[in-house]
């Protein structure tokens, strides 16, 4: 089941993407 990430989760996800690290909360 895929849960749409909240705004905070999207920002968190983006920060991890910039660091080049996989995010465990949402798949980027």
UniProtKB/Swiss-Prot annotation:
It is found in: Secreted. GO terms for biological process: cell adhesion; regulation of blood coagulation. One of its GO terms (cellular component) is extracellular region. Keywords: Cell adhesion, Secreted. It comes from the Eukaryota. Pfam families: Ornatin (PF02088). Belongs to the ornatin family. Potent inhibitor of fibrinogen interaction with platelet receptors expressed on glycoprotein IIb-IIIa complex. May prevent blood from clotting during either feeding and/or storage of ingested blood. This is Ornatin-D. It comes from Placobdella ornata. The lineage of its organism: Eukaryota, Metazoa, Spiralia, Lophotrochozoa, Annelida.
